[in-house]
């Protein structure tokens, strides 16, 4: 199979027939063998009924229904697990991503040898309340990830070599930074293609609000930390813990040595426990020990942890 199109969705019933018809036309015009995987992420507006109707009309349509809304990352990951095509295309269901871009994205993967190609919505039809934070996000993501040639990390329209989606785990809210996940997995040939951005035709965006932007930055910092220290938590926690314990131990030793010297020379000296420095040294030793144990436990957890996605599938077609 040439192409798998993975479409995560939440309450997009109005747009689904038009979305599939557009994809179907592009696929037929270019002679691609394909499948379209709709991942219904807990929709409450009848989206699943529409997907079932599309499935009855076309063997190319597959559907996955979650028991509740889990988020875009688990929906994408579930679609990736089911995808069979040599090239996997992701796009949103809201008609803002153009299926006419599929042939160009496919060629960049198959003929130019890219592992991942991300769309770049150079001209956007979003309000400034969304575009301005997006620019800040992308600038920060480029800096932290080291992927200098991408301008739109969160673009829903992307193309992947099949091996990429089978070797990354998209969990939490990490869908924004899939190129970073791919790079960390060893897929370094990452490209970009300027794509059309359509104005939303049906409904309103489900992803507005301050929390979206705050969570985006927190996710990026989490991803940086995990990619740097995730395999060896002891490297960071053990190091910090050892430094703090050593400083506390040296301070306590000096306080004790000073007390013994004063006793040996019959110099009046208050009790060690009366000194605030003693408690400061003790606190540093305790915190150092806790950090060291945190690193140890982190190592154990990282070795025993497996899949971090806990979504439940209610039905598949």
Where are these regions (language model features)?
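Short, well-formed alpha-helical segments that are part of the catalytic scaffolds
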Residues: 12-27
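Donor nucleotide-sugar binding loop of glycosyltransferases
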Residues: 12-15, 43, 98
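Short beta-strand/loop segment that forms part of the nucleotide-sugar
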Residues: 32-43, 64-65
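A conserved acidic beta->alpha catalytic loop
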Residues: 40-49, 95-96
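Acceptor/aglycone-binding surface of glycosyltransferases and processive sugar-polymer synthases
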Residues: 53, 62-68, 72-82, 87, ...
């Amino acid at each position: 199979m040439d192409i798998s199109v993975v479409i995560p969705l939440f309450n997009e019933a109005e747009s689904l027939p038009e979305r599939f018809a557009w994809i179907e036309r592009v696929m037929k015009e270019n002679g691609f063998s394909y499948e379209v995987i709709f991942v219904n992420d807990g929709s409450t507006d009848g989206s699943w009924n529409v997907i079932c109707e599309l499935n009855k009309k076309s063997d190319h349509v597959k559907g996955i229904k979650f028991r509740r809304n889990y988020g875009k990352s688990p929906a994408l990951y579930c679609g990736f697990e089911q995808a069979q095509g040599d090239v996997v295309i992701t796009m949103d269901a809201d008609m803002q991503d153009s299926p006419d871009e599929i042939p160009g994205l496919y060629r960049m993967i198959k003929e130019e040898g890219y592992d991942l190609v991300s769309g770049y919505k150079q001209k956007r039809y979003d309000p400034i309340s969304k575009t301005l934070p997006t620019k800040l996000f992308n600038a920060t993501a480029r800096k932290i990830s080291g992927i200098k040639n991408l301008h739109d990390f969160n673009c829903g329209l992307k193309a992947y070599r099949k091996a990429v989606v089978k070797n990354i785990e998209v969990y939490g809210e990490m869908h924004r930074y899939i190129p970073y996940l791919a790079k960390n997995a060893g897929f370094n040939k990452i490209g970009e293609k300027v794509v059309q951005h359509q104005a939303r035709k049906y409904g309103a965006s489900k992803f507005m609000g301050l929390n979206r932007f705050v969570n985006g930055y927190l996710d990026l910092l989490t991803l940086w930390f995990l990619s740097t220290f995730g395999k060896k938590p002891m490297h960071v926690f053990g190091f910090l813990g050892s430094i703090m314990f050593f400083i506390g131990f040296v301070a306590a030793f000096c306080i004790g040595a000073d007390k013994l010297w004063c006793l040996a020379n019959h110099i009046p000296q208050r009790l060690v426990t009366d000194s605030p420095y003693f408690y400061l040294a003790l606190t540093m030793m305790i915190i150092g020990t806790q950090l060291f144990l945190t690193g140890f436990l982190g190592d154990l957890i990282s070795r025993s942890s497996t899949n971090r996605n806990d979504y439940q599938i209610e039905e598949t077609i």
